[in-house]
Amino acid sequence: MNNDAMEHTLGGGILTTSGSKQRKTSKFVMGKYTLYETKDRMYIVGSNKRETMFRILEIDLTVPRGELTVLEDNVFFTRNEIMNVLASLEEATEDGLHKKITGYGLLGFIKFTCWYYLIMVTKYSQVAVIGGHGIYHIDGIDIIPITNNYKKPEKSSDEARLLNIFKDLDLTKTFYFSYTYDITNTLQTNILREKLKAVDRCDITIPCGITDYNEMFVWNNNLLSPIFACIDTVFDWFQCIIHGFIDQVNVSVLGKSIYITLIARRSHHFAGARFLKRGVNNKGHVANEVETEQIVTDMILTPFHQPGNGFFDSDRYTSFVQHRGSIPLYWTQDASNLTTKPPIRINVVDPFFSPAALHFDNLFQRYGGGTIQILNLIKTKEKTPRETKLLWEFEQCIDYLNEFLPTLKKLDYTSWDMSRASKQDGQGVIEFLEKYAVNTVTTTGIFHNGPDFASTKIQEGICRSNCIDCLDRTNAAQFVIGKRALGCQLKSLGIIDNSYLEYDSDIVNILTELFHDLGDTIALQYGGSHLVNTMETYRKINQWSSHSRDMIESIKRFYSNSFVDAQRQDAINLFLGHYSWREGFPSLWEMNTDFYLHNAYSLNMPKRSYIHWWNDYNIKSVKELINEELIATGNDVTREKIIKNVRGYPGAFDNYWNEYYLPRSVTWIRDLFAYNMNSTRRYHNALSKQDKAMSPFTSRKQSWLNNKLKMITSSKSLEKAEGRVVETTDLDRDTSPKQELELYEHYLHIISDRSQKLEEKMNSFSYSKYPIFISHESSEIPPMRKVIGEPLVDIAEDFTDVYDDDDDGDDENDEMTTEALLIAPDHVSVDEKFYEKVLNVDDYKPALDDYSAVIHIKPDNLQLYRDLCFSKDIQLDFQ
């Protein structure tokens, strides 16, 4: 059967709406909900932040037990009108109208055995702001029974037991929502959809087949399902929540704020605890599947729009997306024997790898049909085969699937034993990951918004990283890839001119903290403890106390996996709707396994082709689609189309700035989220006045590592052939010492040639022992710059650019200008004793790891350069 003719239902699409199309009203955004109760009805009064407009949702309590009836008339009320409505309800009801609770979000309804419960958000806190839209963390909830004769169930009843199991999933930890921004989709998806509205092409779906919220990441989809059959404005009233991690930091660059936002979205399809959820289910959903998005914003303008008639056209927004997930095979680990490393078993050997095919087809669908890069970090050599069992099977899977894919769409697979590399001397882990990161970001690209489709850069493809647990090793690998992507994003925004970011700089330190917090959160959700191995482990800069910390976290993880995970898995299955109570069927606590809750088998299911295993629509390039349908046809975004298709009268839109500056209350600047955000400024508090001006891109701990990484990644830098796919086989996965020496020798020859040319130009200089003073205003020589840690070749390039002769043969002005510049001004006093103490180059002995000092340059030339460095008119940062 041709897969193109099949209904594509994997991992995306509109939420289950029982045939009714949901619509979202843009008149105003509700942010406050008050629940009133009478004998026969419940009324939810929703209002905007300013409390100037209101709506009413009615719940009928007279329906038979176990049924839910929700009504809404889509009528909008002013403040005076809503007061009159409530007063009339008070008079018309015998027992009166009682105010029950006030909340700030509605999550949905759930039923166990008797009646429904309403889940309401009662407390929340802001964690990020994107385009002026607030993103919030749930801090408190309330569970409200929808009945007029509620009695607390007996402890031994199924109702009470299921209610307690439901409460075991703590919704006040790492669950997030937003009133006005779709956090279930990436920034690229959200902005491209809005641009399509501007050109009246909403028939184009990005990603393919997903037209609304991405159901894969909507954790309260089960809670919303009872309401879809009742009203068609569900998303006006109820908030979609995600489970994962969101944090935001501020990088201060010369007083300008650069926001870095990290969003991790956990899939709810095959969710669960570590040893209880491994591998893949029959629908292609893998365990511990997390999408990580890195958004970098220049906050010179807060909204997505440029001033005037712009519409989602700000070029100050960039993003980059990564993916992690368990190896897509049928495999399990039995933790019942209380061992720290249970044996790995491959339960089903599928010669056609059907679940893996579904999984990768879904990745093609969600990430624009681009190249899927697979970084497999599990062990490749073991005395007793454990992880290697999966290695062999996974490689056969990739080979089989690649056999039928078009050449340009083949899965780009790389296997590398990160655990073994970390036990060897040196920085092999960081070096390999840095080279792989360059290849990854070059292949997939980043998203950078522009005024129209033609100027917008789109990320196509995804890097999928995995180890056994997709925790420690995977998190370190994603950090290094994210670090390279961050450099590319900053370069695209015009903040820096080199996409390499130095380790131990402020911006890398704060990014390390972000990924460390993300890794800890994902590890707690899946493994029951914090990360055991962090970036400090793989960089080998751990403190003596880290070993005891690692041991404690290992013990916590072992305890959680052995005694707590089963209870947590029951709560997840109940919350997500994998289990529903039915009379006469086994109770949740009586089930020996939840395998059939996550794997639905049916004899009537259509079979996918084992050869043409992908959907042709999913592998179609988003860039090609936009170019064919919009740019080539002359239907790109213009001001006139924006005004015609999306700009209504100004009063039709609620001012989302009300989220930022709360109306009807005094707002202190010190209480604003942006004021209290984590920032690189905190690194300056304990430093001297001179160090406070240090760039956030300058390393605070100079090491040979930054020099070496610049060297080994420069040949594959992102500046070359943007969008070109670099084959993974070109990477030096296991660079031998001989190859490394040859690499250094090659670069040393280049530097030596340039230094020899520099020496020839400088030999004719005559200068005294006094420093040379050069005035920027009168000199044609540009200010020199030297960042600590750059290779010496950069110094030679800067110096040669200044003193190189032009090819036109005109040397007259060169001699006159050079001689004039070497004369110190009469009015400048020089401390001769100070300069007599300057380091003697003849006595200088380079350290073993100082690669830049191996070059042979005459001492007098180096002394001249040092004299230039100590000039008071030229401020250099040189050691």
Swiss-Prot record:
It is found in: Vacuole membrane. Its EC number is 3.1.3.-. It is a peripheral membrane protein. Pfam families: Syja_N (PF02383). The keyword Glycoprotein does not apply. Keywords: Hydrolase, Membrane, Phosphoprotein, Vacuole. The keyword Translocase does not apply. Residues 166-528 form the SAC domain. InterPro entries: Fig4-like (IPR043573), SAC_dom (IPR002013). Its cofactor is Mg(2+). Disulfide bonds: none annotated. It is an enzyme of class 3 (hydrolase). Coiled coil: none annotated. Residues 761-879 are annotated as: Required for vacuolar localization. Changing residue 519 to R: In FIG4-1; loss of catalytic activity in vitro. Almost 3-fold increase in PtdIns(3,5)P2 level in vivo. Partially defective in both hyperosmotic shock-induced PtdIns(3,5)P2 elevation and turnover. GO terms for molecular function: phosphatidylinositol-3,5-bisphosphate 5-phosphatase activity. Present with 339 molecules/cell in log phase SD medium. This is Polyphosphoinositide phosphatase.
